[in-house]
C-alpha cells in the first residue's frame, strides 16, 4: 500500500493537495482491506487485493493531477479588468477637465489601481489558509491600528479617520477595517464544533471592532461591518458550526444587535450627549427639511435633468461635493447619460453574482465563509452607494468599489477581491474541513519553553521600565501620556500571553 500511495502521489504536482489525497486513498484502501478480511482473506492477501482494485497508480495519479491543481477564475479576472479600464478612463477624463485640487484622487487613480492590483495578486497567490491561521493576530493588529487612529490620528470634521504616513499620505482606517470582515470569517471557523462558549467568543470578536469604528465616529462603516458579520455568523450557525439551538441563537443574536443601536441612541438622546450637528442631521432626516433636504433636492434635480444618452446641462462638478468618489454615479449620469450608469450597475451586479457563486460553490467551508464575507461587503457598499446617489438614502460616507476615487477605497476593494480569487484558486485542493491551528513540534519543546521563559522575563522587565517612565512622566507633566498607556497595555497583554503559553505547555507535557 505504501508503494502504491508513493507512486500515486508522485504524479500530483500540487504539494498542498498530496496530504489530503493520501489520506483519502489510505482510508479507502483500509476500508477495502477490512471488507476483504471479513470475506475470509488474511491481512496480506486482503491488502494486495485492495491495492489491485484501486487500478494503476500512474494513471490514477495523472487523472487526479488534472483535478487537484490551482484554478484561475478567468471570468472574475475579466470583469475586474473591464471595471479597472472603465475606472481609468473615467478618472482620466475627470483629471483632464478640472484643476488638481478639485479632482482630488482622480489624478492618482491609476497609481492607486496599480497598487490595488499588486495587493490583489499578493493575496491571490498567498494561500487564504495562511490568513486564517494568523486570523486572530491580524484582527488584533487591525484593532490596535484603529485604537491608534482614535488616539492620535488625523482629525477631520471632528472625526479621526486617517493615519498620516511619511510624505503626507494618509490611510483611511474606517475603510481599512473592512478587511476585518473576511478575517472574522476565519475566526468563526476556529470555533467550529464549539458550543455556546464559542458563540460568545465569536460575538466578542464581532463587538470589538464595532465599538472602535463607531467611536471614530464612522457610523456607516460600523453598520456595514455589523450586518456583514451578523450574516456570516448566521450562516455559521445554520451550517452547524456551533452546537447550539439554531433558531433561538439566530433570533436572539439578531434581536440583540438590532436593539443595541436604538438603545445607544436613546441613551445619548436622554443624557443630552448629542452634539448640535448630530441633532440637526437627525431633525433633517426625520422632518424632511434643512440642509439634508436641500442636498437631496439637488441630487433629484440632477437626475431629472439627465438624458438617457449624452451630456446634460447640469454643473455636477461645480455643485456636488465628492462627485468623483461618493457620487461618481451621479457624475457619470450627467456626463454620459443614464444608460451608461445602468450598464455600469449591471456589470457590478454580475461581479457580485460571480463572487457569491464562487464562494457558495466552495467545497471547503473556510473558503466559503471568507469569500462570502468579501461578497457581502461589496454588495452592501454598492447597494447603499446607489441609494445615496439617487437621494433615497441619507448622506453618509460611502464608496463605489473599484470606481470611487480614494486610495484606501481602491486598495481595499482589490484586496478583498484577492481573497476571493485565492479561495477559488485552491477550491479543488482542500477538503471540506481543515485544521488551521498552529503546529507544535514536540522535538523543539525545550527550546520553545526556554524562549518563552526568556521572553517573559524581557517583557516583565520592559513593562516595569515603561511603567516607571510613565509614572515619572506623570509626576513631571501632571498627566499620563497616552502613548505610554498604549505601550504598557500591549506589553502587559504580551506578558499574559507568554505566561499562558507556558502554562499550556506544562499541562500538555506532564
Q: Where are each of the predicted segments found?
A:
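Loop-to-helix entry and N-terminal half of a specific, functionally important transmembrane alpha helix
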Residues: 359-397, 403
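Soluble N-terminal domains of membrane-associated systems
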Residues: 1-77, 81
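Hydrophobic, glycine- and aromatic-enriched re-entrant/interface helices and adjoining loop segments
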Residues: 246-343
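Hydrophobic alpha-helical transmembrane segments
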Residues: 111-119, 334-355
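A structural signal for hydrophobic alpha-helical transmembrane segments in multi-pass membrane proteins
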Residues: 48-157, 205-206, 355, 375, ...
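Transmembrane alpha-helical segments and their membrane-water interfaces
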Residues: 105-134, 171, 177-193, 231-241, ...
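A juxtamembrane structural motif centered on a specific transmembrane helix
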Residues: 194, 392, 398-471, 489-510
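Hydrophobic alpha-helical segments of polytopic membrane proteins
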Residues: 201-208, 220-268
Amino acid at each position: 500500500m505504501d508503494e502504491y500511495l508513493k507512486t500515486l502521489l508522485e504524479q500530483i504536482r500540487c504539494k498542498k493537495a498530496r496530504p489530503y489525497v493520501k489520506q483519502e486513498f489510505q482510508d479507502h484502501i483500509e476500508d477495502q482491506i477490512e471488507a476483504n478480511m471479513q470475506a475470509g482473506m488474511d491481512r496480506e492477501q486482503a491488502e494486495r487485493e485492495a491495492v489491485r482494485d484501486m487500478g494503476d497508480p500512474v494513471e490514477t495519479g495523472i487523472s487526479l493531477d488534472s483535478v487537484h491543481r490551482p484554478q484561475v477564475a478567468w471570468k472574475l479576472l475579466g470583469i475586474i479588468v473591464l471595471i479597472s479600464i472603465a475606472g481609468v478612463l473615467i478618472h482620466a477624463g475627470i483629471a483632464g477637465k478640472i484643476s488638481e485640487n478639485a479632482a482630488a484622487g482622480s489624478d492618482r487613480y491609476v497609481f492607486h489601481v496599480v497598487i490595488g492590483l499588486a495587493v490583489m495578486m499578493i493575496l491571490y497567490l498567498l494561500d487564504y489558509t495562511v490568513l486564517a491561521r494568523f486570523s486572530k493576530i491580524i484582527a488584533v493588529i487591525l484593532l490596535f491600528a484603529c485604537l491608534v487612529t482614535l488616539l492620535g490620528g488625523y482629525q477631520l470634521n471632528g472625526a479621526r479617520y486617517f493615519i498620516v504616513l511619511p510624505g503626507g499620505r494618509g490611510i483611511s482606517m474606517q475603510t481599512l477595517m473592512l478587511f476585518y470582515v473576511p478575517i472574522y470569517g476565519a475566526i468563526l471557523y476556529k470555533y467550529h464544533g464549539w458550543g455556546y462558549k464559542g458563540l460568545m467568543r465569536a460575538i466578542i470578536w464581532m463587538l470589538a471592532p464595532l465599538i472602535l469604528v463607531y467611536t471614530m465616529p464612522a457610523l456607516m462603516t460600523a453598520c456595514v461591518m455589523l450586518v456583514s458579520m451578523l450574516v456570516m455568523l448566521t450562516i455559521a450557525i445554520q451550517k452547524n458550526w456551533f452546537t447550539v439551538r439554531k433558531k433561538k441563537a439566530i433570533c436572539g443574536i439578531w434581536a440583540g444587535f438590532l436593539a443595541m443601536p436604538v438603545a445607544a441612541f436613546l441613551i445619548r438622546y436622554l443624557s443630552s450627549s448629542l452634539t448640535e450637528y448630530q441633532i440637526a442631521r437627525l431633525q433633517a432626516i426625520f422632518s424632511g427639511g434643512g440642509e439634508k433636504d436641500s442636498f437631496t433636492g439637488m441630487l433629484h434635480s440632477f437626475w431629472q435633468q439627465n438624458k438617457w444618452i449624452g451630456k446634460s446641462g447640469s454643473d455636477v462638478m461645480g455643485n456636488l461635493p465628492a462627485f468623483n468618489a461618493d457620487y461618481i454615479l451621479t457624475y457619470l449620469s450627467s456626463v454620459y447619460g443614464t444608460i451608461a450608469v445602468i450598464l455600469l450597475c449591471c456589470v457590478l451586479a454580475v461581479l457580485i453574482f460571480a463572487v457569491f457563486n464562487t464562494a457558495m460553490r466552495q467545497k471547503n467551508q473556510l473558503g466559503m465563509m471568507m469569500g462570502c464575507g468579501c461578497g457581502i461587503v461589496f454588495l452592501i457598499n454598492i447597494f447603499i452607494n446607489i441609494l445615496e446617489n439617487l437621494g433615497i438614502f441619507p448622506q453618509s460616507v460611502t464608496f463605489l468599489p473599484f470606481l470611487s476615487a480614494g486610495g484606501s477605497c481602491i486598495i481595499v476593494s482589490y484586496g478583498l477581491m484577492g481573497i476571493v480569487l485565492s479561495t477559488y484558486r485552491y477550491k479543488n485542493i482542500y477538503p471540506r474541513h481543515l485544521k488551521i491551528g498552529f503546529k507544535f513540534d514536540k522535538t523543539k519543546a525545550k527550546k520553545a519553553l526556554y524562549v518563552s521563559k526568556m521572553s517573559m522575563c524581557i517583557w516583565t522587565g520592559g513593562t516595569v521600565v515603561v511603567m516607571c517612565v510613565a509614572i515619572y512622566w506623570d509626576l513631571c507633566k501632571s498627566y499620563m501620556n497616552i502613548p505610554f498607556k498604549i505601550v504598557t497595555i500591549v506589553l502587559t497583554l504580551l506578558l499574559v500571553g507568554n505566561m499562558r503559553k507556558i502554562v499550556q505547555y506544562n499541562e500538555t507535557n506532564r
